[in-house]
Amino acid sequence: ALNLLSGGSDSPVAAWCMARRGLALHHIHFASPPYTSLRAKLKVRDLARELVEYTGNCTLFVVPYTKPQEYIRDNAPDVLFTVLMRRSMLRIANQVAKKLELQALITGESLAQVASQTMAALACTDQAQDLPVLRPCIGMDKIEIINISRKIGTFETSIEPYEDCCTIFTPPHPKTNPTLDEILAAEAAMPGLAALEAEAAENVEKIYIRMGDDELL
C-alpha cells in the first residue's frame, strides 16, 4: 500500500497500524515549494526513518505539488478548496501506486477532526479514484493518536513547527458538508488540473528509507 505521509502525528500512526498487521507499504508526501521548505521535507524523511523498524525498508515518494495546488487555489471556490485538494492528492497517489502495483492507499484521517474529515467530505474524497483507502485512525480521537505516536517514537518529530502543504491556502471557513455534484462541477471548471497532476506524478523524487538510516539523523 501507499501511505500518504504528512508532517503531522496522524499519518505516521496510520502507517504503524497497518504495518503491524503485516502490510508492506511505501510513503508518499506532497511538497509545495516555496510555500513549504526543505526542512519540512526532511522532517517527513525523518518520520519515515523513525517508522522503518515497523515498516521495513521502503521508499518515500515526494510529489512536487506546487502547480496543482496553485491551480486549485486560483480556480476553485474557496470553501471547497480543501476537499478538492484532497481529491487531487488521492488521484496523484493512485497514479504512483498503480505504477508500483500497490493495492491500496493509507491516510491518517480521523472522523470529524477537521473540515475535510466529515462523512460528507470523506465520501466526496473517496470518489476521486478507485483504489481502496485504508483509514486505521478513523475512530480514534487526537489524544489516542498522540499516545500511540509517543509509543512508537514519532511524536517529537511530528510536532516540529514546519509547514506542510495541507495547511497552506486553507480557507477560513471550509465547507463541511460538500456534495459530490458541486465538487464535480468545480473540477469541470478546472480543465487544466489533470495534466498538472500527471506531471506531478511523473516527477516524484524518490528517497530510499533503509534500516539503520536513523544513525544518519
Regions found by a protein language model. Name each.
Residues 47-75, 164:
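A conserved beta-strand->alpha-helix junction
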Residues 39-50, 92:
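Short alpha-helix adjacent to the SAM-binding motif of class I
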